C-alpha cells in the first residue's frame, strides 16, 4: 500500500441538506483522505453515507463547508467552483448503488469505453483498457452483449469495469458488491486490493463486516 502524508481529499465542517435545512444529511463532517488510503464509510441506513460519497466524488456540492478534491478547492465560503469541480472529476471514478443508472449504451464494450473517450484517451489505449477492465470483473465473454438486458449483478460488474477503464487516482464505490454472490464480492475486493497496492485512493461504502479490515480506516 502506497500512502503519502498530504491529503488528496479534505472536508471541513461540511453540511448538506435535501429539504432546505429542516434536516441535515451531513452536519459538520470533517475528513482527510490521503493518497493510497482505503476509507470505508459504514453506518445505518439514512446516516448520510451515500450523500458523503457523492460529495467526495464531486457529484454534488454541499450547502456549507470547505472541500478539496484531488488538490482542487471545489467549495469554500464563496460557494462552488465549477472549473475546479470539472478538473477534479477527471481523476475520480465512481460506482453507485443502482448500476442500471450508469449503463449508457446497448453494447458492453461501448459502455466501458464511455469514460475513457470523454477523457480523450487514444483509441488503441481505450481498447486495451476495455479488455483489461472486463477481464478484471470476469465479463470478457459479454463484450458484445447488451448490458441493458443483463442481471443486476452483471450490470454492477459492467459499471465497475467502466470505472476501472478510466484509470482514476481516486475511486468512490457505494455498495459496489451489493448484488454479487460471495465469490463475486471476493473477486472485486481482490481488484481493489491490487489498485490500492498501486497507490489508488479508495472510498468504499459498505455494510459487509469482512470489508472492514484492520488496515483500512473506517468512518462511522
State each model region's role:
Residues 42-44:
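The feature captures the beta-strand-to-loop junction immediately N-terminal to the Walker
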Residues 124-142:
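Conserved ABC ATPase "signature" region
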Residues 57:
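Helix-to-loop junction immediately C-terminal to a conserved catalytic motif
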Residues 182-184:
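Helix N-cap at the start of a conserved alpha-helix in ABC-type nucleotide-binding domains
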Residues 65-77, 88:
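Conserved ABC transporter NBD signature motif
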Residues 171-174:
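Catalytic Walker B motif of ABC-type/P-loop ATPase nucleotide-binding domains
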Amino acid at each position: 500500500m502506497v500512502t503519502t502524508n498530504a491529503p488528496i481529499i479534505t472536508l471541513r465542517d461540511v453540511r448538506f441538506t435535501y429539504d432546505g435545512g429542516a434536516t441535515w444529511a451531513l452536519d459538520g463532517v470533517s475528513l482527510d483522505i490521503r493518497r493510497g488510503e482505503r476509507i470505508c464509510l459504514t453506518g445505518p441506513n439514512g446516516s448520510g453515507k451515500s450523500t458523503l460519497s457523492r460529495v467526495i466524488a464531486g457529484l454534488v456540492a454541499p450547502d456549507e463547508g470547505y472541500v478539496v478534491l484531488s488538490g482542487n478547492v471545489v467549495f469554500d465560503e464563496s460557494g462552488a467552483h465549477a472549473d475546479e469541480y470539472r478538473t477534479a472529476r477527471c481523476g475520480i471514478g465512481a460506482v453507485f448503488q443502482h448500476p442500471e443508472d450508469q449503463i449508457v449504451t446497448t453494447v458492453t464494450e461501448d459502455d466501458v469505453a464511455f469514460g475513457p473517450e470523454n477523457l480523450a484517451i487514444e483509441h488503441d489505449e481505450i481498447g486495451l483498457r476495455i479488455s483489461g477492465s472486463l477481464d478484471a470483473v470476469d465479463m470478457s465473454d459479454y463484450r458484445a452483449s447488451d448490458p441493458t438486458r443483463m442481471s443486476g449483478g452483471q450490470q454492477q460488474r459492467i459499471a465497475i469495469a467502466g470505472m476501472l477503464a478510466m484509470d482514476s487516482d481516486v475511486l468512490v464505490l457505494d455498495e459496489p458488491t451489493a448484488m454479487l454472490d460471495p465469490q463475486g464480492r471476493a473477486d472485486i475486493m481482490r481488484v481493489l486490493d491490487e489498485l490500492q497496492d498501486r497507490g489508488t485512493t479508495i472510498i468504499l461504502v459498505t455494510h459487509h463486516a469482512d470489508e472492514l479490515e484492520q488496515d483500512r480506516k473506517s468512518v462511522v
